[in-house]
């Protein structure tokens, strides 16, 4: 029945984008030892990643460079042929909110003895649950956020700063 309603054009309820101030609250709500979650959220936002892209990043897809990190997205919703694209994320001045530092810290801990595998070995649905959990801990209405909130927050923030 749900699929029929969508075919007939019922409007989907859009979730709220995570904007900078909310992102800061969410990051501050993450326990210090939850370095995976911090890296996931900061990389997801700063790279404008889809949930499916985040959970399909492998160790070999990441290259740390002097300016930050390059992440190979092998396949995405709009790249069905699998040509791939590279997302470059720079270092941020504020280390607490720097996605590159958060990712480095997480990789150094998780991959200390192995150099292969998925970076975030979770499902795309888990991404949404993680976002909701920390939105709630930050005092935000978690029902208004979902996995896409990182990507839409990135796009909204970029537009506010003049990106086209």
Residue ranges and their predicted role:
Residues 1-164:
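Extended, non-catalytic subsegments within catalytic or DNA/protein-binding/adaptor domains
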